[in-house]
């Protein structure tokens, strides 16, 4: 497959309208391709049909962009890129298509208020008046998609396609969705959110399947003409809410995972791990903008350190990096970005490409459960009141990742499909709202193979409750609570006590013990004297503990050779350092012996992997803001490797080592600026 070894990619983002004759009047394909070649770009994503719906090639379907005056920009780019040894990924927009929206009102997505998306102004979530959104369930729109994809693949030869915007940006109540749901279920579309209602849950799952099925349809349109063309669907909305309908099932319709992100380096390392594990083939591709921090800031460029961090973080996870640049409306580019900035970065990172694509060493695996993209507390409300960024779904597992990075616990992020073969010492279910039966089958299999679980917040399946010996009875009325350690839990809850319990600034799940065999209560629930929003209070500035209960809020359960820890709320989301330490101790207890250890500071990530029998380590300084401060005196301890030579790549410069604790190799790193890559047993 052409993607193998193809790590350096580029997209010139150009969703440009054509009402002004100035728009795209200064396009210069030769200048652009020359810039890409000089920078060392291996693949160019080229716009074929953007969000405007105005084709950048002579089309018989819809309309061509007037500013091109008949010039085949797309076809010329394909030709020039191939002449210069650059692969081409054809860009095609889906669902976001202004031409389709305006020309075919019957195709439009219809909100719960009965409006099309361009009827809104100045609102978030694409309700700005700019984006024309159509419904993927509409048969007429699907025929249009098929015709467009057939046309592009018939007219041109390219290596891959990026099918963008594979998600619902809103809940759709158009006639097509209403009819489809009625045909499939015999019911009208629901308009009230209730996460305790099986019909509502079934509807949300149905929408997930609609998007996955649509993705499969679009992919089949490409493969029917050019089976060898790779397909990448937009997968960044996996981090969004249930509204998107974007789940891991989309991976059935792609050749590799990819999507654009703008959330910083902790988010990137989390997503890169997830993509690496769910992608059908590698490398996956991580997109982010040249603009700082995102495309809205059209003229502001990220620092060289920041872009270097993006590229190397993707690379060590065996991911390609795609720079999303922003073309000026007149079609001109900023060539210095390529002849200077990106050339320097790619010249440096390409030296490390031969050493990646190994098997990561890790102790913990965070399960990112894409079928549970909701906050169970956001219930019994109208659909129009929904949140587009639900608490917990993304926040909780990323918070867990933050603590693991801080404490130098090597970790992975996995999808549902990975659980069946998961070998992590501990799997983390960080506030997973719901676990499907087939997912529970995989979890039970993992436990039967000796794996351990950490679960926080909801116990999302009755079978899991039974394994724990607990029965969930509800949720605290208090939204500010405490965990009081028992004698058995005192070591894990070090720093907290009955008098000074661990603060939880949120609700707790309530559960009662129904089977105490092999169960140890680590902490019990404590509540403030009053609610947080009442006239009465104990202390005017705070909510001190006052109501002590015997109700369990942290337990350790032994199940065969495996152990499960459950906490009634995600301690990993706590801000105080002492509280995060409790989460770390729980993970450390469950994982046992570490794959490797380090004293690296909290924002420095150490990754280790084995490729073809050789061990490698990368140390990445993932500070979120430039300038990146240099770090000193970092060491890595690797058990069983004493006496091995360690070289700093790419120049094979030997680094200082020593033997500690008999068979442990301690690697002393030189000054860390942005990153280091090391090889054990150097040439």
PLM segments and residue spans:
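Carbohydrate-binding surfaces of carbohydrate-active enzymes
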Residues: 4-6, 35, 77-80, 88-92, ...
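Aromatic-lined carbohydrate-binding/catalytic grooves of carbohydrate-active enzymes
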Residues: 37-73, 96-114, 118-119, 170-181, ...
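Aromatic- and glycine-enriched glycan-recognition loops and surfaces
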Residues: 20-39, 60-84, 143, 213-214, ...
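Active-site-adjacent "subsite" loops/lids of carbohydrate-active enzymes
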Residues: 90, 94-156, 186, 190-204, ...
């Amino acid at each position: 497959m052409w993607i193998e070894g193809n790590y350096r990619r580029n997209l010139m983002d150009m969703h440009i309208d054509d009402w002004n004759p100035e728009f795209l009047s200064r396009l210069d394909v030769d200048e652009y391709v020359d810039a890409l070649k000089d920078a060392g770009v291996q693949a160019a994503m080229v716009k074929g049909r953007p969000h405007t719906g105005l084709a950048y090639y002579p089309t018989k379907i819809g309309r061509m962009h007037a500013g091109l005056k008949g010039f085949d920009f797309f076809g010329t780019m394909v030709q020039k890129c191939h002449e210069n040894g650059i692969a081409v990924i054809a860009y095609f927009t889906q669902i976001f298509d202004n031409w389709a929206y305006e020309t075919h009102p019957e195709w439009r997505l219809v909100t719960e208020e009965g409006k099309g998306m361009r009827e809104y102004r100045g609102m978030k979530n694409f309700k700005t008046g700019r984006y024309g959104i159509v419904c993927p369930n509409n048969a007429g729109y699907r025929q249009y998609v098929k015709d467009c994809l057939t046309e592009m693949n018939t007219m041109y030869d390219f290596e891959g396609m990026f099918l963008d915007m594979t998600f619902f940006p809103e809940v759709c109540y158009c006639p097509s969705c209403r009819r489809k749901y009625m045909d499939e279920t015999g019911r009208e579309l629901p308009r009230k959110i209730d996460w305790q209602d099986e019909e509502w849950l079934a509807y949300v799952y149905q929408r997930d399947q609609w998007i996955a099925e649509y993705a499969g349809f679009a992919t089949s349109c490409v493969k029917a003409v050019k089976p060898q063309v790779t397909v990448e669907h937009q997968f960044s909305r996996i981090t969004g809410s249930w509204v998107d309908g974007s789940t891991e099932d989309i991976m059935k319709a792609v050749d590799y995972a990819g999507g654009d992100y703008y959330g910083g380096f902790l988010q990137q390392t989390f997503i890169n791990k997830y993509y690496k594990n769910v992608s059908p083939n590698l490398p996956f591709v991580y997109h982010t903008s040249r603009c700082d921090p995102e495309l809205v800031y059209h003229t502001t460029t990220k620092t060289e350190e920041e872009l270097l961090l993006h590229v190397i973080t993707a690379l060590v996870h065996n991911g390609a990096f795609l720079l999303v640049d922003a073309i000026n409306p007149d079609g001109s580019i900023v060539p210095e970005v390529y002849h200077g900035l990106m050339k320097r970065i790619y010249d440096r990172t390409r030296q490390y490409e031969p050493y990646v694509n190994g098997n990561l060493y890790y102790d913990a695996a965070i399960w990112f459960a894409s079928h549970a993209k909701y906050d169970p507390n956001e219930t019994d409300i109208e659909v129009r009141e929904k949140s587009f960024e639900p608490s917990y779904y993304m926040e909780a597992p990323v918070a867990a990742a933050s603590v693991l990075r801080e404490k130098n616990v090597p970790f992975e992020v996995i999808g549902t499909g990975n659980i069946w073969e998961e070998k992590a010492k501990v799997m983390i279910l960080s506030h997973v709202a719901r676990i499907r039966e087939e997912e529970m089958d995989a979890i039970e299999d993992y436990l039967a193979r000796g794996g351990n679980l950490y679960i926080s917040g909801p116990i999302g399946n009755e079978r899991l409750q039974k394994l724990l010996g607990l029965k969930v009875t509800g949720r605290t009325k208090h939204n500010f609570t405490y965990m009081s350690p028992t004698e058995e839990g005192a070591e894990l809850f070090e720093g907290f006590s009955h008098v000074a319990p661990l603060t939880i600034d949120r609700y707790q799940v309530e559960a009662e013990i129904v089977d105490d065999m092999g169960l140890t209560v680590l902490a019990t629930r404590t509540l403030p004297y009053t609610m947080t929003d009442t006239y009465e209070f104990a202390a005017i500035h705070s909510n001190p503990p006052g109501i002590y209960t015997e109700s369990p809020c942290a337990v350790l359960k032994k199940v065969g050779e495996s152990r499960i820890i459950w906490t009634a709320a995600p301690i990993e989301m706590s801000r105080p350092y002492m509280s995060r330490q409790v989460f770390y101790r729980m993970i450390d207890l469950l994982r046992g012996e570490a794959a490797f250890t380090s004293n690296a500071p909290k924002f420095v990530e150490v990754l280790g992997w084995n490729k073809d029998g050789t061990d490698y380590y990368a140390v990445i300084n993932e500070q979120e803001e430039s300038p990146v401060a240099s770090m000193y005196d970092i060491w890595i301890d690797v058990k069983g490797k004493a006496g091995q030579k360690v070289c700093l790549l790419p120049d094979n410069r030997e680094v200082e080592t020593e033997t500690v604790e008999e068979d442990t190799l301690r690697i002393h790193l030189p000054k860390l600026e942005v990153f280091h890559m090391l090889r054990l047993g150097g040439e």
